[in-house]
From Swiss-Prot:
One Gene Ontology MF term: heme binding
Record protein name field: Cytochrome c-type biogenesis protein CcmE
Cytoplasmic side: 1-13
One GO cellular component term: plasma membrane
Chief place of localization: membrane
Pfam families for the chain: CcmE
Amino acid sequence: MSWLPKSPKARRRLMLVAAIAPVLAVAAGLTLWGLSDSISFFYTPSQAEAARPAPGRSIQLGGLVAAGSVVKHPDGRVEFTVADQDAEDRVLFQGDLPDLFREGQGVVAIGAFREDGVFEAKRVLAKHDERYMPREVSKALKEQGEWYGDGQRPEHQGDAL
C-alpha cells in the first residue's frame, strides 16, 4: 500500500474524502436528474427544424406570428404559425391567448412537438408593450437579420411574413 500516505492524519483525511466523494456525486446526479424535467430550451423555428427536439420534450418555441395564420375554433382551440426568416412551425393551443397576441408580433410558445411535427403549446406568451420582445426572440431574430429593435421592419421583397 505504497500509495497511501504514511501519516495517520493524512490517511484519515484521505478516507474521509473517499467516503464523502461518492455521496456528493450521487447527490449531484439526483439533483440534475430531478431538474431535467424543468429545463426548457428555447428554439426559433429554424433552430427547431435543425435540432429536431424529441416529440414530447418540453421546449420554448419563439418567433413572429405569421400574418393570416391565426385560426380560432369554436371549441377554444387556436391554431397559428410561428415563423422566422427561414422556417415556420404550426402551433396548436387550447385556451385563452394573451390580450396582446396578434399577427406579426413576437411570441414564445411553451410546449412540445407531437409525432406529426405540430407544436402543441401549453402556454403562450406575447410581448407586453410596443418596444418589448422576449430577449431570446429578439436575439435570434437579430442574428437572422429580421429584428432591428425600433419596431420597424424593412421591406423584404418576396418575404412570406
